[in-house]
Amino acid sequence: MQNQDFIHTLNPEQQKAVLHTEGPLLLLAGAGTGKTKVLTSRIANIIHQNLASPQNILAVTFTNKAAKEMAERVNSLINCYGLNIGTFHSMAARILRDQIEHLNLGLNNRFTIISHDDQLKLVKDIVKLKDIDTKKYAPKLIHIIISRWKDQGLLPTKLSVSDTNLPLQRVAKLVYEEYQKNLLISNVLDFGDLLLYNNELFIKNSEILRYYQEKYRYILIDEYQDTNVVQYLWARMLASLYKNICCVGDDDQSIYGWRGAEVGNILRFEKDFAGATIIKLEQNYRSTLPILAAASNVINNNKNRHGKTLWTDRENGEKIKIISCWSDKEEARYIAGEIDKLVRENRYNAGNIAILVRAGFQTRSFEEAFINSAMPYKIIGGLRFYERMEIRDVLAYIRISLNQNDNLALERIINVPKRAIGAASLNKIRGYALERNISNFAAIKEMLEIGEIKAKSYETLKDLVTKIDNWYERFSIDAPINVVKAILDDSGYLEMLQEEKTEEAFGRIENINEMLRAIAEFNDVHDFIEHSSLVMENEVLETNYGGSVTIMTLHAAKGLEFDVVFLPGWEEGVFPSQRSLDEEGEKGLEEERRIAYVGITRAKKDLYITHAESRKIFYEIVRSYPSRFITEIPDEITIRTSSMKKYNSFYKF
């Protein structure tokens, strides 16, 4: 596209944003309002007007995919070479390669960046070296605390008394100090160090900061609402000379507080950059009017936000369907049936339909419902339910308790949780079993009797054998759910996850609880094992359905769009998450509401919101209540009904 033809394809507000080239600009871009088009057009305009060469423009994104897309779109508008487009980490790494010696830390520009797994291994090694009790102070949690401190721009020497109030924090500081020493000795950095040391470099060396301020005269930052403290400080320092910074974001879509994102960064932009211009992109090109009205009415209940209202010039579209279901199982059946109907009536292809859940554990009931209806589906951002590590672990415990000859099951669980059974001991057990043509479990029993097991492993293996024998007996006389709960307790598996106290571990516990709900539906444990195997093996061809239905969490769906969206589980305690409310109070509620807003605005044409009147928790049917977010959606844009069509007065609050 030559000259400035691209300007004429923009709406008035988009044009204002593109033509604003001097001074700080906050571009509040609502969902589906064309922010990427504006960003790329703005870069093209700066180059076209000869305000800066491509080498003097810095555009920062959160993902390599977004950076690549931005570069391609800029090049489609104007031919340019040398534009600096990349992620926060890639741009920070580039600066450190050139300037690392000025930090005087002993690092050189051949440093390597270590993976998450290597970071965690180093933390574990230090914890072991320092003889720290891992039951009280889980290495994974220590690593998370260290990463969070780095996201806040805090080196060990900068930690305040308030940062180390708790015993866990004091232990984490001790590990952090040793962790950083090890990194420096090895000439390696982790991802958190890249921006952390960039900022240290800028603070300690004003000449280097000035060099990059001159180099990057125009700065553009995408998804500004997702920046953490260290990213925010980095951008602010770089922009403090010329102040030609354009931050694009939507405070209503700030949903990553749990991983360090600070919505306050976008809310205080005007204070950080005096005289800043704020432009709101509110014309939505994605969704129908009822969908936008629902999103606006929900998010308007948040107090800490920049006010904006999405609108569209598209036709009104379908009303939002809000469906009450008798139970969570009925909810899954209803959604699977409705999707089957939409596809068979050729209204939509399966590939244009999504189910967006608040938490990963919710996917199980939908997976099973789709298998029953032979509808192809895919899980995005995670494994299918029965393929998840913790589910496979528990299944292995069940299998070895039913069939003591199951070598694969035994090998999976023998050191989960850790039982100090090393590779040498395992090889010895395998060799003993092969020589005598018996199972590994039988070999362990014999070796315990004749003293062939080393003292270090003897007690743990003897304890495990006793427990497996006990579970084997219990399965013949007790309900499966009771035995599996006993396995989780007796084995220490549940305790292992609880002691981890991480977001990941909490998600695994939620998945196990969901698995227990599934087990509770079976009187015979063999039927459950067979059922789970069939679910894992199921594969439905997509040919006749126009692709697969997408199942994913609301967090994973950010930035995506679908013709039809189903939002299940809109019940108090599920969504908003009770955990968020308990831990974060009003702040947590506002983030939950932003997650709801993101979910609603993924829909282009049709939106279904469902909730269950009851959920089965083991043997108990627990009453559920509609989410407060449902009450925030006006009646006039909805059709509210029951999946059983027995009544429609449930919503007369």
Swiss-Prot record:
Is ATP-binding among this UniProt entry's keywords?
yes
What is catalyzed by this enzyme?
Couples ATP hydrolysis with the unwinding of duplex DNA by translocating in the 3'-5' direction; ATP + H2O = ADP + phosphate + H(+)
* Every UvrD-like helicase ATP-binding domain range: 8-288
Which InterPro entries would you find in this protein's record?
Answer: ATP-dep_DNA_helicase_PcrA (IPR005751), DExx_box_DNA_helicase_dom_sf (IPR013986), DNA_helicase_UvrD-like_C (IPR014017), DNA_helicase_UvrD/REP (IPR000212), P-loop_NTPase (IPR027417), UvrD-like_ATP-bd (IPR014016)
Residues reported in the UniProt entry to bind ATP: 32-37, 286
- List, in alphabetical order, the Gene Ontology terms for molecular function in this entry: 3'-5' DNA helicase activity; ATP binding; ATP hydrolysis activity; DNA binding
A Pfam family this chain is assigned to: UvrD_C
EC number(s) per UniProt? Answer: 5.6.2.4
**One GO term describing the cellular component:** DNA helicase complex
Does the keyword field hold Signal?
A: no
Gene Ontology terms: biological process:
DNA replication; recombinational repair
Keywords, in A-Z order: ATP-binding, DNA damage, DNA repair, DNA replication, DNA-binding, Helicase, Hydrolase, Isomerase, Nucleotide-binding
Q: Where is the UvrD-like helicase C-terminal domain?
A: 289-559
Q: What PROSITE patterns does this protein's entry cite?
A: UVRD_HELICASE_ATP_BIND, UVRD_HELICASE_CTER
Protein family according to the UniProt entry: Belongs to the helicase family. UvrD subfamily.
**Briefly, what is this protein's role?**
Has both ATPase and helicase activities. Unwinds DNA duplexes with 3' to 5' polarity with respect to the bound strand and initiates unwinding most effectively when a single-stranded region is present. Involved in the post-incision events of nucleotide excision repair and methyl-directed mismatch repair.
Q: Which PANTHER family match?
A: ATP-DEPENDENT DNA HELICASE SRS2, UVRD / RECB / PCRA DNA HELICASE FAMILY MEMBER
Name listed for the protein in its UniProt record: Probable DNA helicase II homolog
Q: What is the organism of origin for this protein?
A: Rickettsia conorii (strain ATCC VR-613 / Malish 7)
